[in-house]
Amino acid sequence: RESLYVVNTYAQKYFTDTLYNSDEGKSIGLSYFKERGLSEEIIQRFQLGYAPEGRTVFTDRAIKEGYNLDYLVKAGVTIRVEGEEGKATMHYDRFAGRVMFPIHNITGRVIGFGGRALKKEAKAKYVNSPESEIYHKSKVLYGMPFARKAISTEDNCYLVEGYTDVTSMHQSGIENVVASS
């Protein structure tokens, strides 16, 4: 269980680092967030990021840095495709080429991700982490650790449609806002 938290924390840091320190991350991911009107403070508070293009860029890097492939798969950041008889098993990055929205539990630990494709030809606009030992979609609200105090103070909560709605509302100063994950 703890290993899944460790893998997700690594992935979040990797995606955030890619957003700020790669040409692809800056030109695609950071540009997208800036076009949405998000400030540096909001991008950093929500730990937003960018998953680079390439089928195995993230997974290869994680393995090279000592992360176990089985845990990458269990955490949902890597997809394993079993080869047919006589063919090799393959793996690839679940979120390649997407802006990344880490999903946090109530205490603020990263338990999953939502990734938004920016290319029109993408099969799915949003891809989310699969259910795992630490992430249960129906039990988690996106943005809750950042909204808790405001919900308590205001004694109400707005439920909005998606990740960008939550970050935009927080950007506007309305912080008692969450979305289903």
Give residue spans per PLM region.
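Phosphate-handling DNA/RNA-contact segment within nucleic-acid enzymes
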Residues: R1-K13, P52-S181
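Non-catalytic interaction/clamp surfaces of large macromolecular machines
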Residues: R1-Q44
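Short, well-structured beta-strand/strand-turn elements
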Residues: R36-G49, G173-S181
